[in-house]
Amino acid sequence: ADRAMELLKSLSTDSPWLLVFNTISSHIPFHNYPEAFAEKPDDAMVRYRNAVRYTDKQLGRFFEALSTRPDFENTVVFILGDHDTPVDSVDYLVPQPLGLSASQIFIGIFSADSALFNGLTVREDVASQLDLGPTIFDLAQVREPNHFWGYDLLTQERPAGQPSVFFSQNSYYLGFRDHVLVGGLENEDVYRAAAGGESPYTLTTETADLEWKKRAVGAAKAV
C-alpha cells in the first residue's frame, strides 16, 4: 500500500483522476507477502489465507488514506483480479486443491457516496470484467460511444438470449452453462505459443476439439 499511498498524494483533489494499481501480494503461488507478516509453509492453503489477510490489511491502509482526501465522496474504487484462475482445482503452481469455489470470487465496487447506489436493484444476470469499462464511463458521466464489448451495469440490460463469453487460459473447457459460453486453453498451449511455438488453435489433431475452439472464437466475435 505504500506505493499506492504515495501516488495518491500526488493527485489533485480539484480535478478528476484515474489511479490504476496492480498488486501481486495475493497472486499464486502466494509467496509475495512479507515474511515478517506471516510464515510461508509448504501448505498452499495456509499461504493463500495469509496472502488474503495481508492484501486485506493493505487495502484497509489505502482506504484510510483515501478517506482523508476532500474528494473521497466523489471517488469510486474497483477491486478485481487481473485474470481468473481455477481455484477449485489443482493449479500449475500449487499442486493441491485450494478448496474454494469460483462462486466465492467477487468484483468489489466501493464508494462513500450513498446517492450513487440509490434506486439500484440486485441483478441476477451474468456480469464480468468486460462490463467494467462501460460502467466506469457511466459513473464518470462520459456519454461518448466506446469500443467496449460489455454493458453499463447501472443503466443497460443485456439483450435477451445473447450468450456471455468467458475465456480462461487455464484448463481448457468449453460449453454452455446458464447461457454462458465458456472456453479456454491448456496452460501448455499458452506457454508454448508465448515462447514462439505454434498457435494454440493448430496444436490439436482431434477434429472435435479444434472445432470447439473455433466456435469459441466465432462466438467471441459475434458478441
Model-predicted regions and their roles:
Residues 1-223:
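Solvent-exposed soluble domains appended to multi-pass membrane proteins
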